[in-house]
Amino acid sequence: MRLTWCSGLAVMGFLMLGGVRPALAQQPTGQVVRLGDGQTLTISGFINATWFMNSGRFGGFGQGQNAEWADSTQPATDKTILDGDVRNTRINFTFNGQPVLGKFSPRAVLEADFFGAFNGAPPFGDEQAQLRVRFAYVDLTNGRTTLRIGQFWSPLFGAVPVSLSHIAFPLGYGAAGKVGWRYPGVFLYHDLTVGKPVTIQLQLAAFEGSGPAVGADVATGVGQGEASGMPQLEALLNFSKRSPNLSWSAYIVGHVDWKDTTGTGVAGDNLTGTAVEVGGSINPGKFSVQGNFYTGKAIGQQFGHITQQGDVKGWGAWLQGGYDFTPRWSVFGFYGVDDPKEADSPGLTARARVKNEDVAGMLRFRAGRYALGLELLRANTTWRPTVGGVTFKQDATQVALSVMYTF
């Protein structure tokens, strides 16, 4: 049964890929609108749609463009679903002003996609996706130094796997080594080298504490991180070099945060969350390789430990390789794993995810602003039914055909 539905959708996808006619190559740059007082507004983004077929049930985030790990319970029979998803679709407004303090100029960014609050059940609600804010920040920059205040990615977010289906929820995100989240805060970026062969950038960030709400704070929506009265802190050092035949980058980032596990109004100790992540990429000719590794404690709010909160320790990593057959045809392979340490993780719930592995592959066609991809994702998740119970494994598979137009 599984081979039948996989083969059917794969053949259909390859026929559609083969039928695409060539288009003139062009690089998306966004639409620039000139405003008063020397300001400009750049409108950019993309339309993204995915048609997918799943065998087995994914858990946590969802079944479509946000599928990441296998659910603990699976259908005994009739496992196949066919569905569509357009919530990756994104729009970005970037405002740029003239210098106001010496060489420092203001810039403001507002970005949104359609992974907002769920708008109801089928047959109609699931076709009415709602907007959500991704970024909302204001910069003051002279090119070398940028002060950013507002909502943006924590430095821990790092590298991002290439995909046409899993964009807002990247491959392995909160499931197989890909961590990080966006928060309101203060971010400082400074290029330590200028005009050198290797660019070195320092990033410092202090942003909103985060964590699940407990006790009376559930009603007020105050999480454990906010209740601690302390920010999350991160520092990143990035190295990169670009050349016609070889480009590479490498980074290391450290993280610390605090959570008041008893919430406001109740005396108690804070839980300290820590993490270290290293990652990078290398692009020799037509090949590309990228990935990252993290190890940490109590960073579920950053999508660590297979997105499990509390006093949990563990590590995760992912690696993706790609090859450009031609300027238009490329292939990618992905593997990621996240492995909480059961013996050192008292915060794991009775029914817990103790390991997850994601394997994915994509064949991609690009012609200017247009891209089409056929992807396969398989999640293998190890569950623990109770504390000290015998673990068991579940799996779920997704075949997806995705299209994107970038503007």
Question: Where on the chain are the PLM-derived regions?
Answer:
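C-terminal segment of classical bacterial N-terminal signal peptides
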Residues: 14-23
